[in-house]
């Protein structure tokens, strides 16, 4: 059985598009970046930790379990934007992204007891239009930025702010479907 180690409804929705049966695991994995950790290393480590935590949870009951872990972060320079802690934090993130190009890093990891982990790191570039204070305040107040890396949902109201995207749209949402499908096929789970 395939398990998705994620609380994200977007990842669940995206994984359903691959027509692979799976169960969702509700896990709490700390997402704290070490001082010497690059954004690439950080997102890959968190995805791997989610997958391993999920495997530890289900392996006794399902020895053939395959667990998918994923993490997405928004990066501007060396600054990593996680999920905003409140509306003011969301406003600050959106101001920083306004009129600039940032990267969205999404790591996907598959683990099981029988083989080494398989992983992919997908880097997309997103250019925001220049947003005025009223646009930022209105978007932050709508609630959509909460729980989203970088304080925006590309598939939601923020889509109108995206001037250019290079990379994986589904990766920016939280699960790059092409790369995930390739990993599942390599693992014999698709």
Curated annotation (Swiss-Prot):
Family statement drawn from the similarity comment of this UniProt entry: Belongs to the Maf family. YhdE subfamily.
Species annotation: Xanthomonas euvesicatoria pv. vesicatoria (strain 85-10)
EC number: 3.6.1.9
Primary location: cytoplasm
Residues annotated as signal peptide: none
Domain of life of the source: Bacteria
Enzyme class label: hydrolase
Annotated GO biological process: nucleotide metabolic process
PANTHER family, A to Z: BIFUNCTIONAL DTTP/UTP PYROPHOSPHATASE/METHYLTRANSFERASE PROTEIN-RELATED, BIFUNCTIONAL DTTP_UTP PYROPHOSPHATASE_METHYLTRANSFERASE PROTEIN-RELATED
Cofactor: a divalent metal cation
Protein name: dTTP/UTP pyrophosphatase
This protein's GO CC annotations: cytoplasm
């Amino acid at each position: 059985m395939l398990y998705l180690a994620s609380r994200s409804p977007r990842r669940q929705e995206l994984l359903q598009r691959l027509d692979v049966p799976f169960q969702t695991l509700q896990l709490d994995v700390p997402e704290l970046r070490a001082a010497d950790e690059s954004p690439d290393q950080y997102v890959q480590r968190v995805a791997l930790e989610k997958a391993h935590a999920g495997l530890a949870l289900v392996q006794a009951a399902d020895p053939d379990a395959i667990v998918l872990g994923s993490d997405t972060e928004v990066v501007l320079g060396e600054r990593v934007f996680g999920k905003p802690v409140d509306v003011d934090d969301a406003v600050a993130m959106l101001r920083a992204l306004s009129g600039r190009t940032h990267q969205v890093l999404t790591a996907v990891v598959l683990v099981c007891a029988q083989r080494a982990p398989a992983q992919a790191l997908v880097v997309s570039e997103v250019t925001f239009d220049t947003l005025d204070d009223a646009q930022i305040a209105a978007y932050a107040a709508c609630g959509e930025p909460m729980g989203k890396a970088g304080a925006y949902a590309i598939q939601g109201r923020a889509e109108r702010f995206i001037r250019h995207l290079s990379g994986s749209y589904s990766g920016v949402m939280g699960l790059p479907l092409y790369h995930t499908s390739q990993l599942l096929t390599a693992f014999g789970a698709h």
